[in-house]
Every structure is written in structure tokens, then in C-alpha cells.
């Protein structure tokens, strides 16, 4: 009798995706982040669901309802801390996952990569609308500043902003619709994740060497299920340590004060995971130019596959490209730091140089390094 998991229509899909999936025998811990992201998404949806049971999306009671969750709901403090810090873990895993894709040339699976970039944008949008919900000072002013950027769009900008706000300022209508968006977007993300996996399983996984792994494949279970379980254990340990012992450092102190439209905080800034894009936005003194640069900072990932010039897929054996990659990582850390600083010298010029370098490395230096490495390895053909 054939095993049920190989014949049952539903079990067969799960079997082909997570059990009998042929996987390269040499993929390293950098390939763990896909499963970690899946778990992060499940944690966020579950904790979010329990928070939504007690949260009220009204300007008068939103802040109080979050305080009520932390004080009066059984383990409400833990659910809230897991949700807030879970978002940070989600983005840490996301950035490492994208970085892995760039380093090992996974972006040459174009469909998988493109849906991944759209996923990144959608998750950032979800995090933004979620950050508005506690209705603290930084929630309110963050929402005001970021939505106001759309007014830079010629002709329709102002109308568009007021349409998103549901009035002439960020108010009750804005909070209600942002709560609706924040509830629905994770399910859209889940659907996109399934498409992402669908495209990945069409080609199979890449591997550190960048060579065709078809000659040497092993079943996903038990080899990579146990490997993923170790990564999962470490991530959940980190998340629990954050949520239970140190839940606040990744947030903003201003968000402990209720939203006040009459009092602007001295430094308006988003959460840490958006700071690099915010720094690029601020480095351009023109409003529309800044908005376009902000979009380009993420969308530039879409052109990476088109700019691949090297005859080797992975950077594993390409030291010049490796150097540029780590320069890009350092540059992104620099941009993240600058995004949290006030708009004054020397931070302005540092941000502008770092922004130019970010685009220069991706669009010009990496493709040139690929050509140079081809020449040095006598791979012109």
C-alpha cells in the first residue's frame, strides 16, 4: 500500500514541499531564514489576532486599550511584547534573507526574487500601518509625515493624501482604516509567500557554490527539518529574551506619550527597520526627489538580476564582489544610524554620501566587478 502522504491530494502538496523535497546537500545556515520568516509570520498573525480581540481603533481609546492589554489582560504584556519585538525579528530575518540572496546569486531565479521584493515592500507597509495603531506621539507624527510624502505627487498629491487620511488630517478615520489594513495585509502576505514558494519549487534551491546541485540532492526531511528546528530554537530564544527582559530598546520613548496633534516631537523617525530608507529620503533636499529615492531604495533590488555580469553565480569565489557586498552592508548600517539622527551637519553630508554609495555599489560597481573578475579569471567567452 502506498503511503497516504504520497497519494492524498492535500498531503501530497505538503509532502512535495516539506518532506520529500529534493534539496542541495551543501546549503548552509544562511538557507534557514526562509523557514524562520514563515514562523515569524505565524507568530505575528497569532499574537496580532489576540491583540485585536482587546484593541479599539478609536482615537480616544486606542492608547488606553493598549495600556489595558498590558495591565489587565492575562499575559497581555507578553503578547504585546512578542508582537512588537516579533516585528523586529521578522525584519532581521528578512534583511539576512535578502542579503543571502544577493551574496549567493539567488536573484537569478527571477520570478522568486521579484515576488520576494514585492513581499518585502508589503511587509514594510504592514509594519508601517501597525506602528500607527498604539496612537502614541511617534505613531501619530510618523503617520502624518510618511503619508504626507504622497502630496509630492504632481497634480493629484494633495487629493490623494486627504483621501488616505479620510479627512483633512490624521484622525479617527485614518486610524480605523489603518487597523483594517493591518489586519488584512498579513493574509495577503501569506498568499504571496505561497506564490514565492511555488516559484522556488519550480527551480529548486540555489546553494553556496552557485553550481547546479542536481547531481547531489538529499530529502528535505529529516536533514533540513532538524537543521531548521535548531535555527528556530535560537530565534525563539532571542525573541523571548527580548520580549521578557528588554522589550523597549527597539521602540521609541515618544510612543509612551499619547498622540498630541499640538505638540511635535523634536525628532520624528520610523522604527529601526525603515531608517535606512528614511535616511535616503532625507538626503535629497527636494520632496518629490526624496520620495522617488525612497521607492528606489527598495525597487533597486528588482534590477539586480538584470545587472548580473559575472560568469559565476555565487560570490563565494569572487573576492572583489565580496568586498563590495560587505561595503554595501556597512553602508546600510551607516544609513540606519543616520536615519535616527537629527537633520544637521555632519549627519546631512554623511547621509548624502552613504545614499549615493548605496546606489553606486548596486547599479555600477557590482556589475563592473563581475566583468573585471571574468577578465581576471580569463572567462571573457
UniProtKB/Swiss-Prot annotation:
Q: What is a single cellular component term in the Gene Ontology annotation?
A: mitochondrial inner membrane
Question: Which organism does this sequence originate in?
Answer: Perameles nasuta (Long-nosed bandicoot)
* Keyword vocabulary terms for this entry: Electron transport, Heme, Iron, Membrane, Metal-binding, Mitochondrion, Mitochondrion inner membrane, Respiratory chain, Transmembrane, Transmembrane helix, Transport, Ubiquinone
Q: Which residues cross the membrane?
A: 33-53, 77-98, 113-133, 178-198, 226-246, 288-308, 320-340, 347-367
Report how it sits in the membrane.
Answer: Multi-pass membrane protein
Cofactor annotation comment: Binds 2 heme b groups non-covalently.
Q: Which domain of life is it from?
A: Eukaryota
* Localization in the cell: Mitochondrion inner membrane
Q: Name one GO molecular function term.
A: metal ion binding
Task: From the Swiss-Prot or TrEMBL record, give the protein name.
Answer: Cytochrome b
Q: Does the keyword Calcium apply?
A: no
Positions bound to a ubiquinone: 201
| GO aspect biological process, one term | mitochondrial electron transport, ubiquinol to cytochrome c
Cofactor(s) the record lists: heme b
User: Whom does it interact with, and what assembly results?
Assistant: The cytochrome bc1 complex contains 11 subunits: 3 respiratory subunits (MT-CYB, CYC1 and UQCRFS1), 2 core proteins (UQCRC1 and UQCRC2) and 6 low-molecular weight proteins (UQCRH/QCR6, UQCRB/QCR7, UQCRQ/QCR8, UQCR10/QCR9, UQCR11/QCR10 and a cleavage product of UQCRFS1). This cytochrome bc1 complex then forms a dimer.
Primary location recorded for the protein, binned into one broad class:
mitochondrion
Q: List ligand-binding residues for heme b b566.
A: 97, 196
An additional note in the Swiss-Prot or TrEMBL entry is: Heme 1 (or BL or b562) is low-potential and absorbs at about 562 nm, and heme 2 (or BH or b566) is high-potential and absorbs at about 566 nm.
Binding locations of heme b b562? 83, 182
Q: Which family does it belong to?
A: Belongs to the cytochrome b family.
Which gene is transcribed and translated to give this protein? MT-CYB
Q: What does this protein do?
A: Component of the ubiquinol-cytochrome c reductase complex (complex III or cytochrome b-c1 complex) that is part of the mitochondrial respiratory chain. The b-c1 complex mediates electron transfer from ubiquinol to cytochrome c. Contributes to the generation of a proton gradient across the mitochondrial membrane that is then used for ATP synthesis.
